[in-house]
UniProtKB/Swiss-Prot annotation:
Domain HAMP, chain residue ranges per copy: 307-361
Function of the molecule: Member of the two-component regulatory system RP614/RP562.
Protein name stated in the entry: Putative sensor histidine kinase NtrY-like
Reactions listed under catalytic activity: ATP + protein L-histidine = ADP + protein N-phospho-L-histidine
Species the sequence originates in: Rickettsia prowazekii (strain Madrid E)
Amino acid sequence: MLSDLKQNLRSYFSSRILILALAIASIISVCTTFYVISLEAKNFSTIIGFLLIDLAIFLILGILLTQKFFTKNNDNDSSKLQNRIVIAFSLVAAIPTIIVSVFSVYFFNLSVKAWFDKKISTVLDQSVIVAETYIAEHKVQLKETALAVAEDLSDMYYDLIHNPALFTKTLNTEADMRSLDEAIVLNKSTNTIVANSYLSFSLSFATIPAHLIKKADLGEPVEVKSDPTTIRMLIKLKEYNDVYLLVGRLVDNKIIDHIDATNGAAAEYNSLKNEIDNIQIKFSIMFIFIALLLLFVAINFGVLFTAKIVKPIKKLVTATDKVKDGDLTVQVPENEVDKDEIGTLYAAFNRMIKQLSRQQRDLVIAQRAMAWSDVAKKVAHEIKNPLTPILLASERLLKKFSSEINEKSEFESYLKMIIRHTNDIKNIVSEFVLFARLPAPKFTKSELVYLVKHIIEARKLLNDNIVYTYDSNVDQFDFMCDATQINQVMINVLKNAEESIEGQEFGKIDVILDAKDDFISVIVMDNGKGFPPELIGKATESYVTTSSKGMGVGLAIVKRIVEEHCGVLDIANREDEGAIIDIKFDLKELHLKVRRSGG
């Protein structure tokens, strides 16, 4: 059995660890898949492989969770509730997730279409075209200017070729007149600057690509791209030998920045537009995996949550089945549940079972008492009739013939024995009658302290070999009761104590009256032989006795009277010697009963 328990525990924890490991692996796998999809250099075989791994992990996780749940609950009828709750949790998680997923994908696609609408693409393209047109127009104007300056310089060839100062002055005049930011005349053969305007930057043929110089040799202006903020044109001067004119015009920085921003935005927009399919795939995959993960979490949470709810209900169902089979000793553990509705239900169930057990016990006792009551009536009737003539005949024989018989002492002894045993039988019959015909109490206001003390004094006179003590925390106490029946209670209890002391050298009976809150107790303690342990729980049942002088109805009568007065009779043995009988009356209940009865 111990090995089976270890095996079950090992299997339980291994399955939980496996499920936890798979859950962690699923999260790592999804994140890795997303990373692989996000890479610029995509390997679709790798992406498909990771997607298959994700799907396999989720399928295994789902199978394990389903198997764990349904295997645990398959053989138990009470698991139907747990199954319904888990299914409800799954539906509550799945339906909104599916709805949100569908609408999210739908609105995401709508949003993407709105972002990459044709109108937006047209606006961006037009912006780029406007920017390019602006630059192109500047280039065309600069080309025309370069041709015009080259023409002027060629016309003045003979005046300028041998006069560098005039060449420089003429070049500056052309630059000022045509709004050029720079103008440079370069000699290719000597790689020197022949003339330049005042604000021109130093430049040599080494910085101009060879293929541009070849194009310039054809006589057409060629654009030289060396600085994004300046447009430059290179043209060969016709009349000069290997001499070239380089003119340039600055472009406003704000315009350059605006053009760069426009081109950058357009390029990024087109890049995103080309990647839109991949973005949609990423979003859909991530949303599907997150939805599945949420579904599995909801199922697992449903299993744990329902286990917490259904487990105490199962215990309650099991306990109810035991009660149905007649076991009224069963109790459900209240300390294992929270102090909520389940805890309240547990407490109510335990109270109900205790009450049923007590009522069943009382019913058995009442049925037994009723049966014995019927027997008592018949026996008392049958015995009482011959008792009186026997007793009278014995007394007359003793009176009439005791003086005439020689063996007088033996004759008297025999007759007295007959009389004594006849009286014993008569007392037994009286007990039978009293038990069978115990009337309902007639409640009147009585002074309890006086009643108890009066009975103690009477018992002292009958038993001078027993020491009686009395103690009370009240001097006077008005008590609603049937005084005759309370007298009977005290007499029976004290008589029971006296009989247990018989045969001892020193006997002592302590009587304590204790009034506290809404209760008053009458406690009787003796130093006798006490009750046999096996009879403690049965001492108040009818015809259970340890005495040879009665039929065991004394304490049964006491119990009936005490209960009629809303009290409880508690019987126990003292630790050292003797017994203790505690009679405790509930004054609130007693007053309510008296009020209901019209007393």
